[in-house]
A protein has these predicted regions:
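Hydrophobic/aromatic-rich core segments of domains that either
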Residues: 182-248
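Secondary-structure boundary elements
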Residues: 108-172, 265-269, 275-279, 286
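His-Asp-centered catalytic microenvironments across diverse enzyme cores
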Residues: 75-76, 93, 221-289
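Extracellular adhesion/carbohydrate-binding repeat motifs centered on closely spaced tryptophans
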Residues: 22, 26-112, 130, 203-204, ...
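Catalytic cysteine-centered active-site loop
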Residues: 150, 158-173, 177, 184, ...
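Active-site nucleophilic cysteine motif
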Residues: 131, 135, 176-191
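Sec-dependent N-terminal signal peptides of Gram-positive bacterial secreted proteins and lipoproteins
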Residues: 4-29
């Protein structure tokens, strides 16, 4: 009986050894062993959707083609230097571009609303001046005049003080109402959003020195251009007079409206004070004649 069991055990062991030698997976590292580990299937690399990939390629192509200028992406403004690289952590005139290259007013809420207005009102076929005109008309048509509006903002603006543009533009875009200072602040914010050196100015107009707010834009040559969306709105709405007060010289806007414009403060100096108070880098002055 024992001999019978022993023969069965011996046969089983021999069978295992034979199978091991045939399949090359012998015990130990003999000639039949394969020291190379079995290949593993790599994890699939996440892929963009066709729409995301197309959008990414389009942005890259636009960046490569754009030199020393501005680029809009989903309503947000970026600046590109002469080599095609994004400007970041720097000012271009009064426009500040943060670490990721995106322009910011210093307020995420205002940036979001400005980008939304740009997306609604512009397209890539427009020239920058077309976009500026669209922002002017957006301001004129989307704010309803309600007298003094936000009194604190109005007081600061009317008395030639600084620090009111962001606050007043945010109020007007959120509520759709405001006075001349809110119109001015909103257009200045939107104009900056499409890459213009725009300032919300406050001062006195007319022979009676009436307090008023308007916008001044400094072009690349240093010339100053005036825009007054609130006066255009008011004369159209209440007096049925059709004026075009977009991007005029000081003489032109005075001859059209019959009023003169006198600044109480230099808008650029107000910008410097605001940046200094908040601990931000000081903007470099845009040339101004």
């Amino acid at each position: 009986m024992r001999q019978h069991i022993g023969r069965h055990i011996l046969g089983a062991v021999l069978a295992i050894l034979i199978l091991a030698s045939l399949c090359g997976c012998g015990m130990g590292t003999g000639a039949g062993a394969d020291p190379t580990p079995a290949a593993t299937t790599p994890e699939p690399t996440p892929t963009l959707s066709p729409e995301e990939e197309a959008a990414q390629q389009e942005r890259q192509a636009r960046l490569a083609a754009q030199k020393d200028g501005y680029l809009l992406d989903k309503g947000y403004l970026y600046a590109v230097d002469e080599t095609g690289e994004l400007r970041s952590n720097t000012y271009v005139g009064v426009l500040y571009f943060r670490e990721d290259g995106r322009y910011t007013s210093g307020s995420e809420d205002l940036d979001r609303m400005v980008a939304g207005a740009i997306r609604k009102s512009t397209d890539e076929k427009m020239t920058r001046m077309d976009m500026l005109r669209a922002m002017y008309e957006y301001t004129r048509d989307h704010i309803k005049y309600v007298g003094f509006g936000n009194h604190e903002d109005s007081y600061k603006a009317a008395h030639g003080k600084d620090g009111w543009m962001v606050e007043s533009a945010t109020y007007a875009l959120e509520n759709g109402t405001g006075n001349c200072y809110h119109f001015a602040a909103t257009f200045a914010a939107l104009a900056r959003g499409v890459g213009f050196q725009a300032y919300a100015a406050s001062g006195l107009i007319g022979s009676e020195d009436q307090e008023h707010g308007w916008v001044e834009i400094v072009d690349d040559s240093g010339e100053v251009w005036y825009s007054d969306p609130e006066t255009e709105y008011a004369r159209s709405y209440w007096m049925n007079q059709k004026y075009d007060l977009f991007y005029k010289s000081k003489d032109e806007i005075g001859s059209v409206t019959g009023i003169g414009y006198l600044e109480l403060t230099d808008p650029f100096e107000a910008e410097r004070k605001e940046a200094e108070a908040e601990g931000r880098p000081l903007p470099s002055p845009a040339p101004k004649t």
